[in-house]
Amino acid sequence: MLYWLTQLLQGQYHAFRVFQYLTFRSILASLTALIVGLLCGPLMIRWLRGLQIGQMVRSDGPQTHLSKAGTPTMGGVLILLAITVSCLLWCDLRQTSLWLVLLVTLANGLVGWVDDYRKLVLKNSKGLPGRWKYFWQSVIALVAVSYLYWNASLPVHTQLTVPFFKTVTWDLGVFFPVLAYFVIVGSSNAVNLTDGLDGLAIMPIVMVAGALGVFAYASSNAVYSNYLGIPYVPNTGELTIFCSSIVGAGLGFLWYNSYPAQVFMGDVGSLALGAALGIVAIVVRQELVLLIMGGLFVIETLSVILQVGYFKYSGGKRLFRMAPLHHHFELKGWSEPKVIVRFWIITVVFVLCGLATLKLR
């Protein structure tokens, strides 16, 4: 909205031409989302406390988590509010890729909200049954990937780019929707599994989103993409602003979610933000780079898969003390802040490796 207003004023006031630049609007978007998060955070926390929407803690988990019982959750609503407000203010709303990404994010947030509402308000311990959660995630993903597939007007739209190789691409053709579906649903659930400690998930989300914003910016520019040897994907520049909004909103949320957390994001936040990372990676054609940068989410998910599989086929034995992996280290005696910071450090390494693919080809 403000971007549209600045467009009208450019003819009379040359200073407003600065709003044409993605970099400038990205900074403003990030700051806007940060301010919305910081200002609305206390109001959201008080409101959730008033509704008695508090976290339920597993009795079989680390005993240190028992003190978290009753901590307000569903704070992901605050993150989504900050992202949406920021995008509406600073994005060029004529770009369809922005609306696709934003709608996929909010739709997955709605699925998470229903799950949280059933668990925390209706006191249904199972929340939204797994099969229904997966069903609605699948519907959202299939609608999104079908739109992308049927509107693919350039070869790059269905090509898989292999990191570290300048000329290695695979034309997925009819298999593009399959890959895209698993990226969206998989990313959404992987982030959800990681969100188990104070601030553990949100900081990696911020780092990966920021890096994806760099890819979105470079991919939308023919000169930069040619120089870096990455796919040129027209009309995706506004996703830089979307990613910047995630960065700002995430940092604003971390202010209240850092240890000891005053609020948790809940499924409404984790499912939405995971899906956001997935759909952005698909649109800018960097699915494999997301796999690298989101390595922490991959490791956490694999720990659950391995734990369940090993338990099933070994007759009840466990590979880890507890899954996801962050709980394993807690039960080994690591303090919660130590687990969190070390997992953040791991994410920094993964994100740097992903960014290295911009030049190492």
Swiss-Prot record:
Co-factor requirement: Mg(2+)
InterPro entries: Glycosyl_transferase_4, PNAcMuramoyl-5peptid_Trfase, PNAcMuramoyl-5peptid_Trfase_CS
Keyword Repeat in annotation: no
EC category name: transferase
Catalytic activity: UDP-N-acetyl-alpha-D-muramoyl-L-alanyl-gamma-D-glutamyl-meso-2,6-diaminopimeloyl-D-alanyl-D-alanine + di-trans,octa-cis-undecaprenyl phosphate = di-trans,octa-cis-undecaprenyl diphospho-N-acetyl-alpha-D-muramoyl-L-alanyl-D-glutamyl-meso-2,6-diaminopimeloyl-D-alanyl-D-alanine + UMP
GO CC term, one of those recorded: plasma membrane
Disulphide connectivity of cysteines: none
Primary location class: membrane
Pathway it works in: Cell wall biogenesis; peptidoglycan biosynthesis
Pfam annotation, one family: Glycos_transf_4
Transmembrane segments: 27-47, 70-90, 97-117, 134-154, 167-187, 199-219, 236-256, 263-283, 288-308, 338-358
GO MF term set: metal ion binding; phospho-N-acetylmuramoyl-pentapeptide-transferase activity; UDP-N-acetylmuramoyl-L-alanyl-D-glutamyl-meso-2,6-diaminopimelyl-D-alanyl-D-alanine:undecaprenyl-phosphate transferase activity
Membrane disposition: Multi-pass membrane protein
EC number annotated for this UniProt entry: 2.7.8.13
Protein name: Phospho-N-acetylmuramoyl-pentapeptide-transferase
CDD domains according to UniProt: GT_MraY
Gene responsible for this protein: mraY
A Gene Ontology BP annotation from the UniProt entry: cell wall organization
Family designation: Belongs to the glycosyltransferase 4 family. MraY subfamily.
